[in-house]
Amino acid sequence: MSRIKIFDTTLRDGEQSPGVNLNKAEKLEIAKQLEKYGVDRMEAGFPASSKGDFESVKQIAETIKSSSVIALARAVKSDIDIAYEALKGAEKPAIHIFLATSPIHMTYKLKKSPEQVIETAVNMVTYAKERFDEIEWSAEDATRSDWNFLAQIIEKVIEAGATVINLPDTVGYTTPEEYGKLFRFIKETVPNINQVALSCHCHNDLGMAVANSIAAVENGATQVEGTINGIGERAGNAALEEVAVALKIRSDYYPFETGLILKETKRTSDLVAKLTGMYVQANKAVIGRNAFSHESGIHQDGVLKNTETYEIITPEMVGVSSNTLFLGKHSGRHAFKDKLKEFGVELSEEELKTAFEQFKLLTDQKKEVTDDDLYTILMDIKTDSTVVDKYKLIQFGVSYDTAATPKANVILESPNGSLIEATQQGNGSVEALYKTINYLIAENITLVDYQINSVGGGKDALAESHVQIIINGETINGRGSAQDVLQASAVAFIQAVNRYYVQKKANLTRLVYES
């Protein structure tokens, strides 16, 4: 079996999804889980785009040991220098340099001739080679580029020191047969291609990102790039968990394997969904909640007799298990700490104290506390940002009557420590609550999206709310959890506002580039 390397770009390409704005702590938690998942390489960010991205890449580089940590850079010396500084503490640093090669990009974006593009690519790879042993070079918009020109520029950048060549389908334009032919052409045409690894990077605009990735592997690609849950700009990227499971399940047909630890799939997927606010659709392949459900009576009968009649993927393979009671209201601190070790989450003494207190409060309200409940508490604590003073929810009440307009009263602690209170009406309980919070905060806020989900099951399940707001022109996501739906909704809205102030203080302006 040939080994296919997995290049995860959830923290870079995935974070370019509209409204996704992970803080430094959230990015680090995702990076640590990606390492547990077994990704070979993770693209931690684009350090030249902002101070925040630089600091995040630097922290991840200093933390991750087994996976290679990669920084994105344009074909510009200053970007390469900044990437080098961000990755100084990495065990396995690498740089990813991209430059457009399609006629439309060279003419209208770069305003360079093909000869000038080759010269720039060679010069920047040569410059990067003085700082990095591992260099990935991407031909942006490769699938709309002239194939002969691609072969020419690839040969030159390999001579300059590139170690990985990436042929991205930047706009999700290609098809499996066509993409496979491109890889075969490059393998057969570029004389020094065997000196490097060949990588694919597919977007999902036509719904073929995973199929295109597998077609590339069949035709010489030794690395697949993508994201967890397939998140990303526009229609997203190739879902890495789908690629890995497809190769595993169809190992009878595909002589390839990855190094992913598939039983970590569910945990990884859930974490990314929770922190980005991009929930996994119920019928998503491999990891959707309906992936192992059977509605048809014929199907149910078959599965009961032999699961292999209709299930080609077992829940256990991807880490799906039933939630069970693990701790109760009489559980002590020692038992609680033992349970945390199973999650592999490290807490400071202060964080442990906070987590245990929240757990005890939850056991007063819930008869059964599940792994999902506890993991939600832990992630809320681990990913909290304390960069600036914030608004805090002190108290709220909502009055609802079918014969009257809902009314909400809210008391907040403002960033300066003073208590502020207001009452507003709305067409529903949530609207009344949000109108009151908005009135107290006194910013130009528009609610774009609101979601509420249960964590685990049962009538006393923990509620988790995700909101997306536009505040003074900035799109921000927020997340909140509580046993009460309205409390979770209020916490999510306030968290989104606080994130806006964190970003505003840090003055994080981001440059977004596709590859």
From Swiss-Prot:
Domain Pyruvate carboxyltransferase: 4-266
Residue ranges of the region described as Regulatory domain: 392-515
Pfam families: HCS_D2 (PF22617), HMGL-like (PF00682), LeuA_dimer (PF08502)
Catalyzed reactions per annotation: 3-methyl-2-oxobutanoate + acetyl-CoA + H2O = (2S)-2-isopropylmalate + CoA + H(+)
GO cellular component: cytoplasm
Subcellular location: Cytoplasm
Main location class: cytoplasm
Domain of life, per lineage: Bacteria
Protein keywords: Amino-acid biosynthesis, Branched-chain amino acid biosynthesis, Cytoplasm, Leucine biosynthesis, Manganese, Metal-binding, Transferase
EC number, as in UniProt: 2.3.3.13
Gene Ontology molecular functions: 2-isopropylmalate synthase activity; acetyl-CoA C-acetyltransferase activity; manganese ion binding
GO biological process, one term: L-leucine biosynthetic process
Sites where the protein binds Mn(2+): 13, 201, 203, 237
Pathway where it operates: Amino-acid biosynthesis; L-leucine biosynthesis; L-leucine from 3-methyl-2-oxobutanoate: step 1/4
Cofactor dependency: Mn(2+)
Protein purpose: Catalyzes the condensation of the acetyl group of acetyl-CoA with 3-methyl-2-oxobutanoate (2-ketoisovalerate) to form 3-carboxy-3-hydroxy-4-methylpentanoate (2-isopropylmalate).
Summary of subunit composition and partner proteins: Homodimer.
Family from the record: Belongs to the alpha-IPM synthase/homocitrate synthase family. LeuA type 1 subfamily.
Record-given protein name: 2-isopropylmalate synthase
Name of the coding gene: leuA
